[in-house]
Structure formats: structure tokens, C-alpha cells
Swiss-Prot record:
UniProt-listed InterPro entries: IGPD_sf, ImidazoleglycerolP_deHydtase, ImidazoleglycerP_deHydtase_CS, Ribosomal_Su5_D2-typ_SF
Name of the molecule in the record: Imidazoleglycerol-phosphate dehydratase
GO biological process: L-histidine biosynthetic process
Enzyme Commission designation: 4.2.1.19
Length: 195
């Protein structure tokens, strides 16, 4: 069973994450940050990872700690659910169009975290959500998930469309990477013998 539950509590936030890598994309994400919940819902639905996230944060300051700490906890949950990564495809990629926007994602569940982020969100906010937090989420998620993650915006004029295309592209790439590869059996997908 490729599932994990992570709880993270600090003076700034209280986060709980439950995921099932072999799900159907069911979700119940309640972080208190509306646009972010919408993006997490996209991540779950398009990766087919069942995801339940509950978060409480220091909203009186801003949404930064809530978004970043959710990325940390979700990355930790992904890493825990993958275990030693036997039999997974490991790599995933997607070109995702959404109206004016197109975002490309390539990722490797290598255990070597690195984020390449070439995304330009033209507005500072989407509603009340600070657009710079999109990168902050993916930085935390990739670091704590052990993911080499490249996200490149190829086109886009509307910040909402660009951000949503990024989340969906990562989701579709993640869906490929976490899938079990029947040709690999229980082999670790590396010549090193470990990831």
C-alpha cells in the first residue's frame, strides 16, 4: 500500500496530509487559502493521487507559511509513500495547455531535490493570493519530496491560467513517475541500486 500520513506543527502552522498514490484523484483540501486549495485540487485530480490536506496558519500575517509548510508536508508524504521506489517509472513529463498558457514539466523522483522554475506570473496577486507563493510551494515540495523538478512556461498572459497550467503539468508528470512499471517488477529504477 503506497500511502502516507504526515503531520507538521510549528509556531506558525499546523498541517496534516494524507495521500494514496494508487488512488483515483479524490481530494479534500482545506488550507484556508482559497486559490491554493483550488490548485491542490488540480494536483490531486490530475495526478490520480488521493489527497486530504488540512492546514491552519498564521493568516493574520499572510499565506506564506501555510503554503510553504503544506509543500514541505506534501513532499514528505510523497517520499514516505514511495518508500524505496521499487518498480516505479521514476520519470514523468507533460506539456499542459490551458487557454493562453502552456507549461512544460519534466521531473525525476531521483532523491536529489532541485527546482528549475522558468515561470513569469504577470500579476502580483490572483484574487488575494500572492503569486510568488506558487514557486515557494514547488520549492518546498520538490526539496522535501526529493524531486528534480523543471517547470517552464512556454506561453501565457493570464496569471490564473499560467499557475493552474503549472499545477496540472506537475500533476500529469507526477502521475507518470509514480506509476508502477510492470516491466520493472520490483527493481529500483537506477543502476546505482538505490534512489
Amino acid at each position: 500500500m503506497r500511502r502516507a500520513s504526515i503531520s507538521r506543527q510549528t509556531a506558525e502552522t499546523e498541517i496534516s496530509v494524507d495521500i494514496n498514490l494508487d488512488g483515483t484523484g479524490a481530494y479534500d483540501n482545506q488550507t484556508g487559502v482559497g486559490f491554493f486549495d483550488h490548485m491542490l485540487d488540480q494536483l490531486a485530480r490530475h495526478s490520480l493521487i488521493d489527497m486530504t490536506i488540512s492546514a491552519k496558519g498564521d493568516y493574520h500575517i499572510d499565506d506564506h507559511h501555510t503554503v510553504e509548510d503544506t509543500g514541505i508536508a506534501l513532499g514528505q508524504a510523497l517520499s514516505a509513500a514511495l518508500g524505496d521506489k521499487r518498480g516505479i517509472r521514476r520519470y514523468g513529463e507533460c506539456h499542459l495547455p490551458m487557454d493562453d498558457a502552456q507549461v512544460r514539466c519534466a521531473l525525476d523522483l531521483s532523491g536529489r531535490p532541485f527546482l528549475v522554475w522558468n515561470v513569469d506570473l504577470p500579476t502580483a496577486k490572483i484574487g488575494t493570493f500572492d503569486t510568488e507563493l506558487v514557486r515557494e510551494f514547488f520549492q518546498a515540495f520538490s526539496t522535501h519530496g526529493g524531486i528534480t523538478l523543471h517547470v517552464d512556461q512556454l506561453h501565457g498572459l493570464n496569471s490564473h491560467h499560467i499557475a493552474e497550467a503549472a499545477f496540472k503539468a506537475v500533476a500529469r508528470a507526477l502521475r507518470q513517475a509514480v506509476e508502477s512499471d510492470p516491466r520493472k517488477g520490483d527493481a529500483i529504477p537506477s543502476t546505482k541500486g538505490t534512489l
